[in-house]
Amino acid sequence: MQRLQALALVVGPVIFAASPFFWVDGHYGVTGGVLIAVSTVPWVFGLIGEYERLREHAPVAAGLWLLLLLAGMLGTVAFGLQGFFEGAFGLHDRVGLARFDDYPPLSLLVLWLPGPAFPAAMFVYGALLLWTRAAPPWDTALICLAAVAFPLGRVLRWEWVAYVVDVLVIVAFTHLARRAWQRTREPAGRPNGT
């Protein structure tokens, strides 16, 4: 199970990173939206493995982070599906998002609160890794930097920023996945590879 979770730490971000290649005039589009939504399944599976490791050192903080992460993944799926439906129904010029203004309390719960929770969860994850010394400082720095820059790439749709953020995430998560994979081969009693 731990090896599958380690692999998922790479697969999720790579699928997510493919989405900007399919954006259509600054919109997620059908394919980009599906890639965003689908990426959350392996990514959250891998991050649950990280939660298990973090809760040994900081149970309350790890639990709160997991809650924030799940809310963020809800927002990620919602925005991915919004892009899918916007593309499928031919809605352009942000008309699809503008229609959510007609449903303020519901769109707040589905999009506007959970959406920012994803980069916030990534920042908290990086901070937790640093605090618990569960990863090298450069991994945590890449994750935190990507979390801060994420809104520029995804909300403002600055494609070059989205690509840079995705590369930062893939590099950091690939290293974390490699370390998680190696921990599955360690003899019992050895520290968790930090």
Q: What do the predicted segments below correspond to?
A:
Residues 1-194:
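Hydrophobic, aromatic-enriched alpha-helical segments typical of multi-pass transmembrane helices
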